[in-house]
A protein has these predicted regions:
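N-terminal adaptor-interaction module of cullin-RING ubiquitin ligase components
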Residues: 1-123, 128-148, 153-173, 177-184, ...
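Generic cytosolic/nucleocytoplasmic N-terminal low-complexity/intrinsically disordered segments
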Residues: 4, 19, 55, 67-70, ...
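Short linear motifs in intrinsically disordered/low-complexity regions
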Residues: 8-11, 49-61, 70, 75, ...
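Leucine-rich repeat
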Residues: 9-11, 39, 60-87, 89-97, 102-121, 128-136, 139-146, ...
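Concave beta-strand-loop units of leucine-rich repeat
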Residues: 99-105, 123-130, 148-155, 173-180, ...
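Alpha-helical scaffold segments of alpha-solenoid architecture
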Residues: 220, 245-255, 261-262, 268-293, ...
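Leucine-rich solenoid repeat modules
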Residues: 295-300, 305, 310-431
């Protein structure tokens, strides 16, 4: 049977340029056809947001229908997957971001050294990758700026090798496996990259020992497991916090932890460089909260964004924060315990008397009571320094009268926006 030459095939495929379904079917004829069709299909990437939804669904549907077809056996499915990855690795020379979520041995494919050499941001799902893949990648994937690790387990020698090989690793995010324990070796290898890493996100307190990174500027710690205050994990993490020193730290974001004494020590050791502090915790032991708030007031003169919880015992310390932290742009004060409903007016009075002129965003708890007179007096004081946003989380004690007063000041241009906010600030009403 006579085969069409390349020129003829190119003419035919170009005529079919708008018929994506036919072009996708041509991918499966043979390798020669596949090599000619791919450049045409990839002239516009499927992730280009200018594509309309109908076109995106068509493209995605065609390329995945072979994998979902019951008649398409597993061995053929794996073979097709492998050929697609081979083509991808060999032909794409300037990929900067990569999400590695496959058991295919990509590091062994032709062109892998060039492909991975140029990758700057890599996201890997550990339990989906062959053990030797990361070892092989460590030979040529050495210029990552950002590494995101999913399903991190107790120990993975390939991951250790990959991190050890990096020349300029700056950002690391670690998400744990549900059964993972502490991986000391991972902590050690990150410590060896302390001169370059400036952004660390830990989505569990039980993944690695918290190491001191000399150039760390951003630190995020999420206790999603919500370990009990007396658990071994919390006690161990308290020690890590107390012994850690991040003198260049600028952003501290902590969720689900109430280690206030240790956090106070950490803040003291930042040498007054903190610009953003967010400590979110609810229904927990508030021991040492006063020490923590005092540490902010005494050691954070440059802080611009502040989000913390308080109780009726500590609200008086707000004055010292407002007096000492004169660069504040955004403040969020939340109620840790619901018995604090009486302190709303006192907080507003402190804000009236001591707010820095730089303040333009304010979010307060709706679990506190605000008298109409003080609420109005506070908004009147905003004529001296305009608020871009005034928000109330929840609205337990916010009445229609409060809303009407706020609307009046929005209409007069004293504040740009008033919002009732809900958990995570993802759902809100506008005025």
């Amino acid at each position: 049977m006579t085969e069409l030459n390349i020129d003829c095939l190119n003419l035919i495929f170009n005529e079919l340029r708008k018929d994506k379904e036919t072009l996708y079917s041509c991918l499966l004829v043979n390798k020669r056809w596949c090599l000619l069709v791919v450049p045409i299909l990839w002239e516009k990437h499927t992730w280009n947001f200018y594509h309309d939804e109908a076109e995106k669904k068509t493209i995605d549907g065609i390329i995945t229908k072979f994998f979902k077809d019951k008649k398409f056996k597993d061995d053929k499915r794996k073979l097709l997957e492998q050929e697609i990855y081979k083509l991808f690795v060999n032909e794409c020379k300037n990929i900067k971001e990569m999400d590695l979520y496959t058991s295919q041995p990509l590091s062994l494919f032709q062109g892998a050294s060039t492909f991975f050499y140029n990758v700057k941001k890599l996201s890997i799902t550990i339990n989906c990758i062959l053990p030797n893949t990361l070892h092989e990648m460590a030979k040529f994937c050495i210029y990552l700026n950002e590494l995101i690790i999913h399903n991190c387990s107790q120990y993975n020698s390939g991951l250790i090798s990959l991190i050890d090989s990096q020349k300029n690793l700056k950002i690391v995010s670690i998400y744990p496996d549900s059964k993972a324990g502490t991986c000391k070796e991972l902590g050690k290898v990150l410590g060896r990259k302390g001169n370059t890493i400036n952004d660390l996100s830990l989505y569990s307190i039980n993944i690695i020992p918290l190491i001191s990174l000399v150039n760390l500027k951003n630190l995020l710690i999420y206790n999603f497991e919500l370990y009990d205050i007396n658990s071994i994990e919390i006690k161990r993490f308290r020690q890590y916090l107390e012994n850690s020193k991040f003198s260049n730290l600028q952003i501290l974001d902590v969720y689900g932890l109430s280690c206030f004494k240790e956090l106070a020590t950490l803040i003291k050791n930042t040498e007054e460089n903190l610009l953003e502090i967010s400590i979110i915790t609810k229904y927990v032991n508030t021991n040492n909260l006063e020490i923590f708030i005092n540490s902010i007031a005494n050691n954070c003169p440059k802080v611009r964004d502040l989000s913390i919880g308080i109780t009726s015992k500590e609200f008086i310390l707000i004055k010292s924060i407002l007096l000492n932290c004169r660069n504040l742009i955004c403040i969020e004060f939340d109620s840790i315990c619901y018995e604090n409903d009486i302190i709303g007016d006192e907080i507003l009075n402190y804000l009236i008397d001591y707010s820095p002129k730089s303040l333009n965003k304010l979010i307060l708890s709706g679990n506190w009571k605000y008298s109409i007179d003080i609420f109005k007096r506070f908004l009147e004081s905003c004529r001296n320094h305009k608020l871009i946003l005034f928000g109330i989380t929840y609205e337990i004690f916010i009445t229609d009268d409060h809303v009407e007063i706020a609307r009046k000041y929005v209409n007069e241009g004293v504040i740009d926006e008033f919002k009732i906010l809900y958990p995570s600030h993802t759902s809100h009403s506008y005025i």
